[in-house]
Amino acid sequence: MVEKRTQPLARDAMAYVLAGGRGSRLKELTDRRAKPAVYFGGKARIIDFALSNALNSGIRRIGVATQYKAHSLIRHLQRGWNFFRPERNESFDILPASQRVSETQWYEGTADAVYQNIDIIEDHGVEYMVILAGDHVYKMDYELMLQQHVDSGADVTVGCLEVPRMEATGFGVMHVDNADRIIAFVEKPADPPGIPGNPDMALASMGIYVFHTKFLMDMLRRDAADPKSSRDFGKDIIPYIVEHGKAVAHRFTHSCVRSDFEREAYWRDVGTIDAYWQANIDLTHITPELDIYDSTWPIWTFSEIKPPAKFVHDDENRRGSATSSLVSGDCIISGAALNRSLLFTGVRVNSYSRLENAVVLPDVTIGRHSILRNVVIDSRVVIPEGLVVGDDPELDAKRFRRTESGVCLITQTMIDKLGM
């Protein structure tokens, strides 16, 4: 007889978010911040999606492991995620790489980032561990994954989704049987195996793992004692369990959270400039693929106390306006025109300028008579008067980071070199 559950499994779980990665494919956008700390969607940071999923799923104990250029990430977590209360049996731990196990080692891999804090985890006394990547954009109910983990009797449950086969080189790729038990797992293969019967697609790991806590601690201690291990979940821990235990796949379509008009299960890596730009610009559509307005599954973040956005001037050639755009608080659009653009907090766009398909990070100032198309502008950049981007591909490529699809990343260092 199956024991009846009296409370959600999430109440006896800890979410452990791996947030130490650089995200080198985002180029200069991660020169000063880790990928999980990169801004997204007008207000949030990328890490807020994994954290919000945990909170909305009912998890009240969260740990975040940080490493690469962590200052802005730690500051964001301290300001935006400081509402957990011990008296309510809640906790939020920020766990920077601090050589707690060895005086000579930082986090050596994803598994080591958990192992080095094993005493903190055990002090929480939770039954389940939900290991999360902090650098993906998606909405997911982890309670449903926890339920499958318990019901299946798995040693580990791995979140997965189908992706085009040749896009799976950056993920762990698995084969499963008819019951979704994982029978083979390879990390970041150069030639990913396709799904039987659907060879153009591969079943990719989302970097989400559910364990019973005691089993995970045993696995981490065994792995730490292995001199040949690379201390990584995808390379070491998961393949070992596939071979010696029971690993089960959890399909993202079974637990993704969708509002009424979200047609497909939405998950994005946003690991390249093109992918980052596209995911942000998609939010300007009438019915975007990701609904950030879904009040039943809010994306929690740090909300600054800022005045509303303001649009000024209404002359024939000098009108502050925005079409199909997201404009955050404390922005002033002074006689400029925006189309299909997303502006974060504190942006100033001065007269006679035009922005189209622009993603503008916080506290940017755009000078008069500027024309900016298909751009990502890093925070605190000052765009000089009369700058034109998006008309001359060769000139853009000489001055800025231009992708093959024509998106330009603009940083202050690049602007300074122009001498304008």
From Swiss-Prot:
Q: List the InterPro entries hit by this protein, alphabetically.
A: ADP-Glc_PPase (IPR011831), ADP_Glu_pyroP_CS (IPR005836), GlgC_bac (IPR023049), GlmU/GlgC-like_hexapep (IPR056818), NTP_transferase_dom (IPR005835), Nucleotide-diphossugar_trans (IPR029044), Trimer_LpxA-like_sf (IPR011004)
* GO BP terms, alphabetized: glycogen biosynthetic process
Does the record bear Transferase in its keywords?
Answer: yes
GO molecular function, one example? ATP binding
Residues annotated to bind alpha-D-glucose 1-phosphate? Y107, G172, E187, K188, S205
Chain segments annotated as transmembrane? none
Q: Which reaction does it catalyse?
A: alpha-D-glucose 1-phosphate + ATP + H(+) = ADP-alpha-D-glucose + diphosphate
Tell me the keywords, alphabetical order: ATP-binding, Carbohydrate metabolism, Glycogen biosynthesis, Glycogen metabolism, Nucleotide-binding, Nucleotidyltransferase, Transferase
Q: Name one Pfam family in it.
A: Hexapep_GlmU
Pathway(s) of this molecule: Glycan biosynthesis; glycogen biosynthesis
- The enzyme's E.C. designation: 2.7.7.27
Family designation: Belongs to the bacterial/plant glucose-1-phosphate adenylyltransferase family.
Q: What does this protein do?
A: Involved in the biosynthesis of ADP-glucose, a building block required for the elongation reactions to produce glycogen. Catalyzes the reaction between ATP and alpha-D-glucose 1-phosphate (G1P) to produce pyrophosphate and ADP-Glc.
Identify the HAMAP family for this entry. GlgC
Describe its partners and assembly state: Homotetramer.
Among PANTHER family, the record links this protein to: GLUCOSE-1-PHOSPHATE ADENYLYLTRANSFERASE (PTHR43523:SF2), GLUCOSE-1-PHOSPHATE ADENYLYLTRANSFERASE-RELATED (PTHR43523)
This chain belongs to the protein called Glucose-1-phosphate adenylyltransferase
What gene name does this entry carry? glgC
